[in-house]
Design a protein with these regions (language model features):
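Glycine-rich His-Gly loop
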Residues: 17, 47-49
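Gly/serine-rich nucleotide phosphate-binding loop at the start of the catalytic core
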Residues: 38-46
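Class I S-adenosyl-L-methionine-dependent methyltransferase module
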Residues: 42-43, 51-117
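Class I SAM-dependent methyltransferase Rossmann-like catalytic core
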Residues: 2-39, 59-64, 68
Length: 117
């Protein structure tokens, strides 16, 4: 099948922290927490992971500001369900100073939640 037009490059920085990232990373945090409860060692392989972190102040993130409908809506929310609160806590830990300026990618989240084997 012939392609109709130029192939556009995908740059995740435009989409970092959006609703899809929130869902993927919420599941990732929950799965890693569950796996870490077991004594047996485990590996994390993410075939679709992007960068370890993204600046939400970058021109890419600000251009579409998709994070505003994703992580930004949850970041200061109170009374979140436990799994969602745990995920947001990981994003907060990644930011250090409290302000939402950075968004962790899957590699950073996995690294934060791994334990010694």
């Amino acid at each position: 099948m012939a392609q109709s037009g130029p192939m556009l490059a995908y740059r995740h920085a435009f989409h970092a922290g959006n609703h899809a990232d929130v869902l993927k990373h919420l599941v990732l945090v929950s799965v890693l927490r569950h796996m870490a409860q077991k004594e047996k060692g485990f590996r994390v392989v993410d075939t679709h992971a992007g960068a370890g972190g993204y600046s939400l102040e970058s021109r890419y993130a600000r251009q579409k500001a998709e994070y505003a409908a994703g992580i930004e809506r949850l970041y200061d929310a109170a009374d979140l369900p436990p799994a969602l609160a745990d995920y947001v806590a990981q994003v907060r830990a990644f930011n250090g100073d409290g302000a939402l300026k950075q968004y962790p990618g899957s590699p950073a989240i996995a690294r934060m939640l791994l334990r010694p084997q």
